[in-house]
């Protein structure tokens, strides 16, 4: 099965210069946990911001989320796959890079969607492989320096 058959095609983004407070509010209103991050200079996707990025890299460190910007805490570089890739390729990328979401690109390398662990669970992926991916991305990474 192809990634385009299981991905979420409605793609919203946020700019690197958007405050974390505004970003968190946007995520809350959309009931989502991540957004692609776009550079205001060239309108290209340069990273991903997740609810976890906001909590771990900002709130837990005592930063002011009303003045700190997305570009300061986003995850980068991006983990991507193509819409015509097999679902197993997306799961392999998630497992290797320890991420829960992968940006989906078309044949012109333009963003067209996101594929998440939840999307994979809805597809025909082997349950043992899905379990392996979930375990790997859920294993704590080495702690970041303060």
What are these regions (language model features)?
Residues 8-17, 43:
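Short N-terminal leader segment in a subset of presequences, especially plant chloroplast
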Residues 13-31, 38, 81-98, 104-106, ...:
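The conserved cystathionine-beta-synthase
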Residues 27, 35-53, 94, 102-118:
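A glycine-centered beta-loop-beta connector
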């Amino acid at each position: 099965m192809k990634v385009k058959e299981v991905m979420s095609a409605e793609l919203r983004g946020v700019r690197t210069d958007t405050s974390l407070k505004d970003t968190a509010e946007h995520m809350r209103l959309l009931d989502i946990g991540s957004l692609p991050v776009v550079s205001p200079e060239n309108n290209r996707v340069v990273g991903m911001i997740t609810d976890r990025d906001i909590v771990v890299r900002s709130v837990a460190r005592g930063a002011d989320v009303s003045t700190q910007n997305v570009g300061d805490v986003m995850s980068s570089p991006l983990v991507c796959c193509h819409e015509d890739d097999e679902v197993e390729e997306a799961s392999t990328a998630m497992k290797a890079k320890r991420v829960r979401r992968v940006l989906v690109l078309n044949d012109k390398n333009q963003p067209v969607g996101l594929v998440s662990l939840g999307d994979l669970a809805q597809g025909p992926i082997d349950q043992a492989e899905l379990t392996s991916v979930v375990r790997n991305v859920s294993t704590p990474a080495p702690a970041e320096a303060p």
